[in-house]
């Protein structure tokens, strides 16, 4: 590991994860004095500013490998750190990436999920100052409120006024034909950048779509038996990235479709945890996302699965 990469890891742990210099020294096998000197060197050299100004903000070798394998436009792999809130850390990483990509007054489309909502929380001031417009990618107001509820009241936000999932395909189609719903769906398709979470079938009760009550435990087991490994916006994918066929839920969803998601120029998937590795690969295989924010251990598991 080069000194610059070591410095960037130390800076991330210190400024974003709140570890003490002693904790970082124990984690990396360095003395507290060495950690302190590297932080000071980083500040003097300009590597450390308000943000971590370094190409080693993530884990460069893993980023390069994933970028080349999947032809990604953007990829960030955060350094592994045990016993920290992974969704919050990924949210910070995603927020930093979006701040570097999105231009003033552009339209950002957002999918539901704990990690994407963490990113929105960290983007709150940036969204206001840059006059970024927001639109949701799916129905279901509840799953979005932990992120949208933190934004300035003056922010431009278009929310699909419908549930994520209707009781039948016919009811879902009726919702989609309502002008108030249709107009937001059209706006979502015209977004400049999108950020989405990736769910894993093996998450069990932890998945947002389950915790929000949109699918049952029995349905999740059935989806797994049909070959599903994960989902984006409630659309379930096989390991090869193809959508699982004959899934009633796909006709009952209210939101943009996967082909429509692919028309958005930049779609960033944000997900981490070893249990999500296969689902992330499926999303990449299906080319539903062309950017990724994840963490080091997840990336290593992904690469092992690809061998």
Swiss-Prot record:
GO terms for biological process: regulation of DNA-templated transcription. It comes from the Bacteria. Keywords: Cytoplasm, DNA-binding, Repressor, Transcription, Transcription regulation. Belongs to the SorC transcriptional regulatory family. It is found in: Cytoplasm. This is Transcriptional regulator LsrR. Coiled coil: none annotated. It comes from Photorhabdus laumondii subsp. laumondii (strain DSM 15139 / CIP 105565 / TT01) (Photorhabdus luminescens subsp. laumondii). Pfam families: Crp, Sugar-bind. Transcriptional regulator that represses the expression of the lsr operon in the absence of the quorum-sensing signaling molecule autoinducer 2 (AI-2). It also represses the expression of the lsrRK operon. Acts by binding to the intergenic region between the lsr operon and lsrR. In the presence of phosphorylated autoinducer-2 (phospho-AI-2), LsrR is inactivated, leading to the transcription of the genes. GO terms for molecular function: carbohydrate binding; DNA binding. GO terms for cellular component: cytoplasm. Residues 21-44 bind DNA. Inactivated by phosphorylated autoinducer-2 (phospho-AI-2). Phospho-AI-2 acts by binding to LsrR, which is then unable to bind to the promoter regions, allowing the transcription of the target genes.
């Amino acid at each position: 590991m080069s000194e610059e990469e070591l410095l960037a890891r130390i800076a991330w742990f210190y400024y974003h994860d709140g570890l003490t210099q002693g904790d970082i020294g124990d984690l990396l096998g360095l003395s507290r004095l060495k950690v302190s000197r590297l932080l000071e060197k980083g500040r003097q050299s300009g590597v450390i500013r308000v943000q971590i100004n370094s190409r080693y903000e993530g884990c460069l070798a893993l980023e390069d490998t994933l970028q080349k394998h999947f032809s990604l436009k953007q990829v960030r792999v955060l350094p592994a750190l045990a016993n920290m809130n992974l969704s919050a850390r990924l949210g910070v990483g995603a927020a930093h990436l979006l701040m570097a990509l999105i231009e003033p007054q552009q339209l950002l489309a957002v999918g539901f999920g704990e990690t994407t909502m963490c990113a929105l929380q960290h983007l709150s001031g940036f969204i206001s100052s840059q006059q970024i417009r927001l639109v949701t990618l799916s129905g279901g107001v509840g799953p979005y409120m932990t992120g949208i509820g933190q934004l300035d009241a003056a922010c431009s936000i278009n929310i699909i006024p419908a549930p994520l999932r209707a009781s039948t395909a016919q009811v879902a189609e009726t919702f989609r034909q309502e002008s108030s719903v249709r107009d937001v769906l059209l706006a979502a398709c015209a977004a400049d950048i999108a950020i989405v979470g990736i769910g894993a079938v093996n998450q069990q009760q932890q998945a947002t779509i389950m915790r929000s009550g949109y699918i049952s435990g029995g349905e999740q087991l059935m989806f797994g038996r049909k070959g599903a490994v994960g989902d984006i916006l409630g659309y379930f994918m096989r390991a090869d990235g193809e959508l699982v066929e004959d899934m009633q839920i796909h006709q009952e969803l209210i939101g943009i479709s996967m082909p429509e998601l692919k028309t958005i120029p930049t779609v960033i998937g944000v997900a981490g945890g070893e249990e999500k590795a296969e689902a992330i690969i499926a999303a990449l295989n299906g080319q539903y996302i062309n950017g990724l924010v994840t963490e080091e251990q997840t990336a290593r598991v992904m690469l092992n699965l690809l061998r």
